[in-house]
Amino acid sequence: MMFLEMQRAFMLHGRRAVTRSAVGVRYISEDIQQKDAQAGEKATATATGVIYKSDEETLMYFDNVYPRATSLWRPTQWYNILLSNQSREAVREKIMRLASPASNPVHGLELRSTIPIKRDGGVFATFRVPREYTRAQVNALIQANTQQESSKSLLAAFTRAAAFPVKGVPWIEDLKRLPNNVVRVEVEGPALSEEELYSLFRRYGTILDIYPAGKNGYATIRYRSFRGAICAKNCVSGIEINGSTLHVKFEPVVRAHAIRDFFVNHPRIAIPLLIALLSICAVLIFDPIREFSIEQKITRMYTLSRDNFVVKSILRLTSYTVSSVKHLWGYDDDQPEKRQLWQERVEKVNDLKMWLEENNNTFVVVTGPRGSGKHELVMQHTLHDRPNVLYLDCDTLIKSRTDSKFLRNAAHQIGYFPIFPWLNSVTTLVDLAVQGLTGQKSGLSESKETQFRNMLNTAMMSIRHIALSGYKATLHSGDDVTTVKEEDYLQQHPERKPVIVIDRFSNKAEINGFVYKELADWASMLVQMNIAHVIFLTESVSPNQLLAEALPNQVFKFLFLSDASKDSARSYVLSQLYPSSPAYSEKMPAADADANEEYRKEIDRALEPIGGRMLDLQAFVRRVKSGEEPSEALEKMVEQASEQITQIFLSERSEPIKTAQAWELIELLSQNDVVKYGDIVFRPLFKSSPEAGLLELEKNGLITISRNRGVLQDIRPAKPLFKAAFSYLLQDKDLSIVLRTGYYLRLIAFETGRIKKWEEELRLLAKVSDQRICKSRLNYLASKIDASSGVINSCEDKVKEMSKRI
């Protein structure tokens, strides 16, 4: 109705229908209103920016109805929507409750319209003035009621609202002009004095300072709070005083780009500060998650697998219950034991368990040749019922070719999650960019050594938390209170400490060799802090020096695993094939005693070349259980071992000199159980660097070398089965001829290379004018060339002879 009346008045009186004081000439002109009326568009406040009201209405502004926006990303603007009802009906009900409460109602007061200004946190409300009240009386009552009602809340200091009569003509706009505690007053007409400005604006809040209008043509008023500035802007803007119209708006926020300017103008300060803040955030956010992930990896508390202690306990209880029921029914379960060892290994398992129940404060080092069953003895026989175990495989870490692959493997083994290996490339580029801009490195990029060390430090904190999970600072016994230190608790409860198993530990590697040093130092800290038992599994005694440097002045607990004796190996195989003596006689292939005895002898003959190496015995048992005869199983195992030797040591991909050295040792060890180191030193292929060549072959698993006070002494096959494989390679005529021919050709190439070096030296000596000076050297070189030529001639003759056999 209001819009129709205004439109009708405009059509009757033309452009004079709307006066300046009524709608504010600055905001909307009569021409615009005329065009809107002719087009039939509504003259709403949101469309035109002007609030229209009649003489019987009053316009009030309520603040603190919505959370005001002091920035574009203020979070209260968003979560407040979830915490409170901000619908149009709810806001109207709230305003009416504040303006006319039940305790002091304004009879006949009618709320006609509300226009929310969510950016400023307030609402414009239009009320119809009752006939028995004047506009001033209604405004005073609404102000008093609002102040009284909003003060009743317990959070009144934060939620208190206020109502102010609108004296001017507010401009309803939704521009991106954020509220500020400083308002700018533009005056159309004669300027106002400071006293007049203070009198007009003070009622909305405490004013800190007033800056009169200067050459810029506007005055500035600084409030102590945002609320005062917002209310002044919405209630005073558009007012006309003494022929001057005041237009109030917020002073533009000049700090919008302060952070950007700080980074641009002070990069040497800003970039390290940003990196420090990011590091702090990463530590606060991700470190607790990573510690929890590592704890879960060790305890397996939330993993539904057989390694979970709870699942393991349930399975143990179930197995015991089933066995008890079967025993009551008279049925004996003759299933074979899952874990069987010969007597020597049983004693070692008992020793290892006893050490874990004590506070040794030192390393436990389990040493044995490759395939001796170190992993099985420790993990399956000793720690199978231990609740907290962390297993680390050094071989997986050492063989990681790229940095990201190394970090992923390390994180997977430790349980370190989350990890972002792709950040290495990004941080490296950022570091280069920062260095180009500032002239100094940012320190953002970290090497894989540093990141691996950080992983271990985080794991140490998790291990400590697990070890102290049952710790209580005080113990109450009646009226007595005993204080217990963490060190005393760990000393009294060694069973609470986790067990860290570090497998395939060595002292050096071609790549990622730092892993051994870092693990040794980390393990020494765990032992010194008395928060974990640490077990190292090694193939030789060479890593002992590295461990001694990490944990000096300590005597290690050593456990040496050797091959089983003939009787122990035979007993182990028979116990695996036929777990109980009654079943043994039933399951034998022959029914009579002679056949049984013959079968035993066949197994003994098969075990003779296999020896007592644990993994080979297990492979033999699996083959026999699958249906193979003992002799057939032995034959296939020898063929498999010989194929492994040819692929690793005698293939064309290997270095010629190393292949020739390997074949020479194969020939010697096929005829002798032991070869002395002194017999190898003076052979042509080993003469230049005998120790390096032998150690390389030992590292690759072809031979094993015993030492006497650190000096190489005896050379043996890496495992007993290899001796049979060596003999197999020599007995196979066709294969032996091919391999032997390759050996001679490599030996010829080796001697030819030596002759070339000597001939080059002879050319240099030939340029000397006085040959008498070099006579002794010339004779030496001539003798060496003669010797090498003799070797070449001998090898060529042998190659020709073998070619005739093919």
From Swiss-Prot:
GO terms for biological process: mitochondrial genome maintenance; mRNA processing. Keywords: Membrane, Mitochondrion, Mitochondrion inner membrane, mRNA processing, RNA-binding, Transit peptide, Transmembrane, Transmembrane helix. It is a single-pass membrane protein. SUPFAM superfamilies: P-loop containing nucleoside triphosphate hydrolases (SSF52540), RNA-binding domain, RBD (SSF54928). The chain crosses the membrane at residues 269-289. The keyword tRNA-binding does not apply. It is found in: Mitochondrion inner membrane. Residues 290-806 are mitochondrial intermembrane. Residues 181-253 form the RRM domain. Belongs to the YME2 family. This is Mitochondrial escape protein 2.
